[in-house]
Amino acid sequence: SATGCGQMTFNQKLAGHWVSGSCESAGSGSYIKRDFTLTESTWKLNATVYNDAACTVKFLGLDIAGPYTVVQESTAVAGATEVNYQVTDRRLIPLSDGAVQLLMQGKCGAGPWAVNQIADIALTGCAPLGFPSNAQCPGGELDLNQIDGNNLFFGDRSADLCKARPTKLGAYPVTRAQ
Protein backbone atom coordinates (compact mmCIF):
# COMPACT_ATOMS: atom_id res chain seq x y z
CA SER A 1 0.00 0.00 0.00
CA ALA A 2 1.11 3.56 -0.63
CA THR A 3 2.37 5.87 2.08
CA GLY A 4 0.84 9.27 2.82
CA CYS A 5 0.27 11.79 0.02
CA GLY A 6 0.18 9.02 -2.59
CA GLN A 7 3.93 8.34 -2.39
CA MET A 8 5.12 4.85 -3.26
CA THR A 9 7.36 3.03 -0.78
CA PHE A 10 10.84 2.03 -1.95
CA ASN A 11 9.67 -1.61 -1.84
CA GLN A 12 6.86 -0.75 -4.26
CA LYS A 13 9.32 1.04 -6.55
CA LEU A 14 11.67 -1.99 -6.51
CA ALA A 15 8.90 -4.46 -7.35
CA GLY A 16 9.11 -5.61 -10.95
CA HIS A 17 11.24 -7.35 -13.54
CA TRP A 18 14.70 -5.88 -14.18
CA VAL A 19 17.19 -7.07 -16.83
CA SER A 20 20.67 -6.27 -18.10
CA GLY A 21 20.58 -3.87 -21.02
CA SER A 22 23.72 -5.40 -22.50
CA CYS A 23 26.54 -7.82 -21.85
CA GLU A 24 28.30 -6.54 -18.69
CA SER A 25 31.96 -6.99 -17.79
CA ALA A 26 32.29 -9.08 -14.63
CA GLY A 27 36.09 -8.84 -14.46
CA SER A 28 38.69 -11.56 -15.03
CA GLY A 29 37.67 -11.90 -18.69
CA SER A 30 34.11 -12.94 -17.90
CA TYR A 31 30.83 -11.24 -18.74
CA ILE A 32 27.35 -11.46 -17.27
CA LYS A 33 23.68 -10.88 -18.01
CA ARG A 34 21.38 -10.42 -15.00
CA ASP A 35 17.62 -10.94 -14.70
CA PHE A 36 16.03 -9.80 -11.41
CA THR A 37 12.46 -10.31 -10.26
CA LEU A 38 11.48 -8.37 -7.13
CA THR A 39 8.22 -8.25 -5.19
CA GLU A 40 7.64 -5.88 -2.28
CA SER A 41 9.44 -8.37 0.02
CA THR A 42 11.38 -10.96 -2.03
CA TRP A 43 14.03 -10.99 -4.73
CA LYS A 44 15.30 -13.49 -7.29
CA LEU A 45 18.32 -13.27 -9.56
CA ASN A 46 18.90 -15.46 -12.59
CA ALA A 47 22.32 -14.67 -14.02
CA THR A 48 24.36 -16.18 -16.83
CA VAL A 49 28.13 -15.82 -16.95
CA TYR A 50 29.78 -15.85 -20.39
CA ASN A 51 33.33 -16.28 -21.68
CA ASP A 52 33.05 -13.58 -24.35
CA ALA A 53 32.17 -9.89 -24.59
CA ALA A 54 29.28 -10.62 -26.98
CA CYS A 55 27.68 -12.96 -24.39
CA THR A 56 27.40 -15.87 -26.80
CA VAL A 57 29.62 -18.50 -25.08
CA LYS A 58 27.83 -19.59 -21.89
CA PHE A 59 29.99 -20.58 -18.91
CA LEU A 60 27.83 -20.76 -15.79
CA GLY A 61 24.30 -20.08 -14.58
CA LEU A 62 23.40 -18.75 -11.15
CA ASP A 63 20.02 -18.63 -9.40
CA ILE A 64 19.79 -16.80 -6.07
CA ALA A 65 16.66 -15.84 -4.11
CA GLY A 66 15.36 -14.76 -0.73
CA PRO A 67 13.64 -11.97 1.19
CA TYR A 68 14.97 -8.43 1.43
CA THR A 69 14.65 -5.55 3.86
CA VAL A 70 14.88 -1.84 3.08
CA VAL A 71 17.02 -0.31 5.85
CA GLN A 72 17.30 3.46 5.30
CA GLU A 73 18.45 6.14 2.91
CA SER A 74 22.19 5.86 2.30
CA THR A 75 24.45 8.29 4.10
CA ALA A 76 27.34 7.35 1.78
CA VAL A 77 25.65 7.70 -1.64
CA ALA A 78 23.18 10.53 -2.29
CA GLY A 79 19.87 9.26 -3.65
CA ALA A 80 20.63 5.61 -2.84
CA THR A 81 18.88 3.36 -0.33
CA GLU A 82 20.46 0.73 1.92
CA VAL A 83 18.92 -2.71 1.36
CA ASN A 84 19.79 -6.06 2.98
CA TYR A 85 19.35 -9.06 0.65
CA GLN A 86 18.93 -12.35 2.51
CA VAL A 87 19.83 -15.50 0.58
CA THR A 88 17.68 -18.58 1.16
CA ASP A 89 18.33 -20.28 -2.20
CA ARG A 90 21.64 -20.34 -4.08
CA ARG A 91 22.10 -22.66 -7.05
CA LEU A 92 24.77 -23.02 -9.73
CA ILE A 93 24.39 -24.56 -13.16
CA PRO A 94 27.66 -25.29 -14.99
CA LEU A 95 27.01 -24.59 -18.67
CA SER A 96 30.41 -25.69 -19.99
CA ASP A 97 33.17 -28.21 -19.32
CA GLY A 98 35.35 -25.32 -18.14
CA ALA A 99 32.80 -24.44 -15.47
CA VAL A 100 32.69 -28.07 -14.30
CA GLN A 101 36.49 -28.12 -14.01
CA LEU A 102 36.50 -24.87 -12.00
CA LEU A 103 33.79 -26.10 -9.63
CA MET A 104 35.65 -29.38 -9.00
CA GLN A 105 38.76 -27.47 -7.80
CA GLY A 106 37.50 -26.42 -4.40
CA LYS A 107 34.76 -26.65 -1.85
CA CYS A 108 31.74 -25.87 -3.94
CA GLY A 109 28.50 -27.74 -3.42
CA ALA A 110 28.27 -31.43 -2.66
CA GLY A 111 29.32 -32.52 -6.17
CA PRO A 112 29.84 -34.26 -8.43
CA TRP A 113 29.42 -31.56 -11.06
CA ALA A 114 28.13 -32.09 -14.60
CA VAL A 115 27.19 -29.73 -17.42
CA ASN A 116 23.56 -28.51 -17.16
CA GLN A 117 23.04 -30.14 -13.73
CA ILE A 118 21.74 -27.71 -11.10
CA ALA A 119 23.44 -27.91 -7.70
CA ASP A 120 22.44 -26.19 -4.47
CA ILE A 121 25.37 -24.36 -2.84
CA ALA A 122 23.44 -22.63 -0.03
CA LEU A 123 24.97 -24.87 2.66
CA THR A 124 28.52 -25.13 1.29
CA GLY A 125 29.07 -21.89 -0.58
CA CYS A 126 31.50 -21.96 -3.48
CA ALA A 127 35.03 -20.81 -2.65
CA PRO A 128 36.34 -20.84 -6.26
CA LEU A 129 33.66 -18.29 -7.20
CA GLY A 130 33.72 -16.31 -3.95
CA PHE A 131 30.20 -17.28 -2.85
CA PRO A 132 29.78 -17.69 0.91
CA SER A 133 27.54 -20.32 2.44
CA ASN A 134 24.34 -19.04 4.04
CA ALA A 135 25.94 -19.70 7.46
CA GLN A 136 28.98 -17.57 6.52
CA CYS A 137 26.70 -14.66 5.59
CA PRO A 138 23.79 -14.92 8.05
CA GLY A 139 22.78 -11.26 7.74
CA GLY A 140 22.58 -11.47 3.97
CA GLU A 141 24.30 -9.11 1.55
CA LEU A 142 24.54 -5.49 2.66
CA ASP A 143 23.79 -3.56 -0.51
CA LEU A 144 22.74 -0.24 -2.02
CA ASN A 145 20.03 0.43 -4.58
CA GLN A 146 19.21 3.51 -6.56
CA ILE A 147 16.38 3.86 -9.05
CA ASP A 148 16.99 6.38 -11.82
CA GLY A 149 14.04 6.42 -14.22
CA ASN A 150 13.75 2.85 -15.55
CA ASN A 151 17.25 1.92 -14.34
CA LEU A 152 18.02 0.11 -11.08
CA PHE A 153 21.58 0.32 -9.77
CA PHE A 154 23.04 -2.04 -7.17
CA GLY A 155 26.14 -1.36 -5.10
CA ASP A 156 29.67 -1.99 -6.33
CA ARG A 157 30.55 -5.70 -5.95
CA SER A 158 34.27 -5.27 -5.12
CA ALA A 159 33.91 -5.69 -1.32
CA ASP A 160 32.68 -8.57 0.84
CA LEU A 161 29.00 -7.62 1.06
CA CYS A 162 28.53 -9.93 4.06
CA LYS A 163 30.73 -7.59 6.10
CA ALA A 164 30.47 -4.11 4.59
CA ARG A 165 27.96 -2.14 2.55
CA PRO A 166 29.27 -0.68 -0.74
CA THR A 167 30.19 3.01 -0.70
CA LYS A 168 29.49 3.51 -4.41
CA LEU A 169 27.11 2.19 -7.02
CA GLY A 170 28.02 -0.41 -9.62
CA ALA A 171 28.68 0.68 -13.20
CA TYR A 172 25.91 -1.35 -14.85
CA PRO A 173 22.22 -0.82 -14.07
CA VAL A 174 19.46 -3.27 -14.84
CA THR A 175 16.48 -1.85 -16.73
CA ARG A 176 12.81 -2.30 -15.91
CA ALA A 177 11.37 -4.80 -18.39
CA GLN A 178 7.97 -3.99 -19.86
Each predicted region: which residue ranges?
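N-terminal helix-cap/turn-to-beta initiation motif at the start of protein domains
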Residues: G4-G21, Y31, D35-T37
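Contiguous, well-ordered beta-strand patches that form the walls/edges
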Residues: S20-G29, K44-Q178
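Conserved beta-hairpin
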Residues: F36-L45
